[in-house]
Design a protein with these regions (language model features):
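Flexible nucleotide-binding loop
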Residues: 97
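Acetyl-CoA-dependent GNAT
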Residues: 5-93, 101-106, 110, 114, ...
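C-terminal end segment of the histidine kinase catalytic
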Residues: 168-173
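Conserved catalytic-core motifs of GNAT/GCN5-like acyltransferases
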Residues: 39, 120-123, 128-131, 135-159
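Short acidic N-proximal helix/loop "leader" segments that mark the beginning
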Residues: 1-2
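Conserved GNAT acetyl-CoA-binding A-motif
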Residues: 111-123
Length: 173
């Protein structure tokens, strides 16, 4: 990595579109998903945007490298004391330096500070490095569904959950 990435914690016009496009590029190139995956991401982004994301208690982290969007991570309020980790993706050039771990730790600390009792996320099992990171923070797989989707013959969609009341006070795993 030639320069250090910067992290921006506020949305500007165009950022939500960049999150959607970045997911399509990264997961298309690395896992072979088709444009329907972008549609899936777009639907979650649209739901959040239409209700005013980010509201107090939510968070956005936008990662930029030399002015280019190279990653994102969000914490969204899902009601009933629950929050979701959404849109967590980093381009290859910024992986492997602890950035993902740091960002996840920050948003989980924020979730605990705000008073969420549970945090969940949805992903697919083929993202092995991400799964390792989630388990390090205490997330557990609560459901998995292997089926054709996003142009692939078979992909295992998973839901992870973390009960914040069972989490150590320090979320800096």
């Amino acid at each position: 990595m030639s320069a250090d990435p910067t992290i921006r914690r506020e949305l500007r016009p165009g950022d939500l579109g960049a999150i959607i496009a970045h997911h399509g590029r990264v997961y298309g190139e690395e896992y072979g998903v088709d444009a329907t995956f972008e549609g899936h991401v777009a639907s979650t982004v649209a739901r959040a945007a239409n209700r005013g994301f980010p509201s107090p208690g939510e968070a956005i982290c936008l990662v930029e490298l030399e002015g280019e969007h190279v990653g994102s991570l969000a914490l969204t309020d899902e009601g009933n004391g629950e929050a979701a980790i959404r849109w967590f993706v980093l381009s290859a050039e910024v992986r492997g330096h602890g950035l993902g771990r740091r960002l996840l730790g920050e948003v989980l600390a924020r979730a605990a500070e705000v008073g969420y009792t549970r945090v969940w996320l949805e992903t697919f099992s083929e993202l092995e490095a991400a799964a390792h990171l989630y388990r390090d923070y205490g997330f557990e797989v609560v459901s998995a569904d292997a089926a054709p989707r996003w142009g692939l013959e078979r992909i295992t969609y998973q839901r992870y959950e973390l009960e914040l009341s069972k989490t150590p006070a320090s979320l800096s795993a």
